């Protein structure tokens, strides 16, 4: 199904171990995971209420039994692996992992991720526009087979 994100989604769970979390209902002032939709995936965080054990990942919500399957762990207090939670109440909420974010500057422009130092282009389509190029481009290669043109030549 679809990856769905919603704001202010938070429930509690008493999950023990590394399995699927049974969700116990929305915290006061928050929405339930049901807003994600049955069978859809979402980014989640599960954290014990002391904050020592936590996990961020991609989970699948199921309305039958109101569960969240911990499908893919993106980061955790267990070195990026599933956390084996111990007894007690945990918070489960929708989050947006920093590694999935698009970084914007203060003007709202995407921050460049750098330019490759060198690369080999293969199977490139289109005609790059370059200044200072002379000669003709044959018609078979998308050109007009002329070195200059006047109004009406094209």
For the regions a language model picked out, list residue spans one by one.
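Extracellular repetitive beta-rich solenoid segments
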Residues: 2-7, 14-154
